[in-house]
Amino acid sequence: MVAMKYVIAMIRPERLDAVKRELQKIEVSRLTVSSVSGYGAQKGYMEIYRAMEYDANLLEKIKIEIAVNDEFLEPTIEAIKTGAKGSDGYVGSGKIFVLPLENVIRIRTNETGPEAI
């Protein structure tokens, strides 16, 4: 059986279109996109509401989830890095997580494994 990976990327919201364009170039077209909040090196920021300061330490991010066969793993990672970084990259440009994927099942056809991706 061909090995599969589950790629999770956290990126800046304004870089989503660029990441999608890069993924389309390598024919990766099936992905899940979610709006999430979090913080890392950016640490968030202070907000003032009704004369009170609040630590708004959660920043808006985009979470992209993609299941790929091993042959698509490195091109997928490079596409995400290229799109998310832009021309020079910033603190908070994102992170990519790669996890082993044991199985995939397409509910409609009952296909499993790499064919279901």
Swiss-Prot record:
Protein species of origin: Methanosarcina mazei (strain ATCC BAA-159 / DSM 3647 / Goe1 / Go1 / JCM 11833 / OCM 88) (Methanosarcina frisia)
Major site of localization recorded for this protein: cytoplasm
Cross-referenced SMART domains: P-II (SM00938)
Residues that hold ADP according to the record: 32, 40-42, 92-95
Assembly information from the UniProt record: Homotrimer. Interacts and forms stable complexes with the glutamine synthetase GlnA1.
Activity regulation, free text: Inhibitory effects on GlnA1 are abolished in the presence of the effector 2-oxoglutarate.
Function: Involved in the regulation of nitrogen metabolism. Regulates the activity of its targets by protein-protein interaction in response to the nitrogen status of the cell. Allows finetuning control of the glutamine synthetase GlnA1 under changing nitrogen availabilities via direct protein interaction.
Keywords, comma-separated and alphabetical: ATP-binding, Cytoplasm, Nucleotide-binding
Positions contributing to ATP binding: 32, 40-42, 92-95
Effect of deleting the gene: Disruption mutant exhibits a partial growth defect under nitrogen limitation when molecular nitrogen is used as the sole nitrogen source.
A molecular function GO annotation: enzyme regulator activity
Protein name in UniProt: Nitrogen regulatory protein GlnK1
Stretches assigned to coiled coil: none
GO annotation, cellular component aspect: cytosol
Family: Belongs to the P(II) protein family.
Anything else known: Unlike the enteric GlnK proteins, Glnk1 is not covalently modified by uridylylation under nitrogen limitation.
Stimuli inducing this protein: Expressed under nitrogen-limiting conditions.
Location(s) in or outside the cell: Cytoplasm
Listed GO biological process terms: regulation of nitrogen utilization
